[in-house]
Regions:
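Helix-to-loop junction immediately C-terminal to a conserved catalytic motif
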Residues: 20
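Helix N-cap at the start of a conserved alpha-helix in ABC-type nucleotide-binding domains
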Residues: 142-143
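Conserved ABC transporter NBD signature motif
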Residues: 28-35, 45
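ABC ATPase nucleotide-binding domain helical subdomain, centered on the C-loop/LSGGQ "ABC signature"
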Residues: 31, 64-105, 149-150, 158
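The feature captures the beta-strand-to-loop junction immediately N-terminal to the Walker
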Residues: 5-7
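Catalytic Walker B motif of ABC-type/P-loop ATPase nucleotide-binding domains
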Residues: 131-134
Length: 203
């Protein structure tokens, strides 16, 4: 369980995209179970790994279609579990059409928090073993963020979790911190040690 910290433009999002196989490293290589990520079948990667990026989008179509993109066989139980985890279930329950509620292109008309929790639910439906989250609580208020943290604590188990975040509360989910600056890793260590060095209260 790792947090990636750094200022805007430090390279956090780029690193997550490289880990997800969406960008190719110009130097060095990304290894997954000691195998170069470039040698792995992209279909296997997509099945085992989920990335919530800042550029993720909702499209014109029903809630169900948006949530099951890439997982058309997902059951209503799978969908409800993911919605509960992300915190989006109350929003869906308020819609009289439920999962048939129509989403506008880009999620137009939804709040930033609603879009974010729906995109997170889309990722969680597939129950990936490796979870990459880029600022997952950036659009959430403190209450929604606290709910998400508690849900992820219970769900994450033995999965690999890597979070890029500016929000101190999210550090409750990790035991290791990597600090980036201008595309380079400048600190890497146990959470408590890094926070002490940074002068932050331990989470």
């Amino acid at each position: 369980k790792i947090a990636i910290l750094g200022r805007n433009g430090a390279g956090k999002s780029t690193l997550l995209q490289m880990l997800a196989g969406m960008r190719i490293a110009q130097q060095g290589q990304v290894l997954l179970d000691n195998i170069s990520i470039g040698q792995l079948d992209p279909a296997d990667l997509r099945r085992d790994m989920g990335l919530l990026s800042q550029t993720g989008r909702l499209f014109f179509g029903s809630l169900r279609e948006n949530l099951t993109m890439g997982m058309p066989e997902a059951s209503d139980e799978d969908i409800e579990r993911a919605l509960t985890l992300s915190g989006a279930l109350p929003f869906v329950q308020k819609q009289k059409n439920g999962l048939n509620y129509m989403i506008q292109e880009g999620g137009f008309g939804l709040s930033g928090g609603q879009r974010q929790t729906l995109l997170l639910a889309r990722l969680l439906i597939s129950q990936p073993n490796i979870v990459l989250l880029d600022e997952p609580s950036a659009s959430l208020d403190e209450m929604a963020e606290a709910y998400l943290i508690e849900q992820l604590k219970q769900w994450i188990g033995h999965r690999t979790l890597i979070i890029a975040t500016h929000r101190t509360a999210m550090l409750q989910l990790v035991d290791r911190i990597i600090v980036m600056d201008q595309g380079r890793i400048v600190m890497d260590g146990a959470k408590e040690a890094i926070l002490r060095e940074q002068g932050e209260p331990t989470a």
